[in-house]
């Protein structure tokens, strides 16, 4: 059976864009944002906590759920680092140094915007 690369890519895209997969991707993203805001509960702990919920899912939905959760925890740990001075994970330790002092001076929005812009640029650069 000879399948071209384009046929396989179209099949993979159709599987990815099914509403059930998009729902689990969105749920993983929302839960990952909530877990990332809590200091000490990062991506690895979140994946370990939510792994039992994936046992009854098909492989694609479970992967979409875990991918959504893992992708946003390093972005959402910026919130406690800037606002409270407590790094959510080790990835946000440097954010505490500049971001929390900016928040003390009333520039929390500017610190969060800079952190999210850097996260966006890094994510896009890493994707390509």
Regions found by a protein language model. Name each.
Residues 11, 94-105:
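Short amphipathic alpha-helical coupling elements at transmembrane boundaries
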């Amino acid at each position: 059976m000879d399948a071209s690369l384009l046929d396989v890519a179209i099949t993979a895209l159709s599987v990815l864009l099914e509403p059930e997969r998009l729902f689990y991707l969105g749920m993983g993203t929302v839960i990952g944002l909530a877990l990332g805001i809590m200091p000490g509960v990062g991506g690895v702990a979140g994946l370990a906590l939510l792994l039992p919920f994936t046992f009854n899912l098909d492989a694609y939905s479970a992967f979409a759920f875990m991918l959504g959760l893992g992708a946003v925890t390093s972005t959402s740990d910026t919130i406690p680092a800037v606002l409270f001075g407590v790094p959510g994970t080790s990835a946000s330790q440097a954010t505490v140094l500049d971001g929390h002092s900016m928040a003390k001076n009333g520039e929390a929005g500017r610190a969060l915007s800079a952190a999210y812009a850097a996260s966006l640029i890094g994510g896009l650069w890493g994707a390509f």
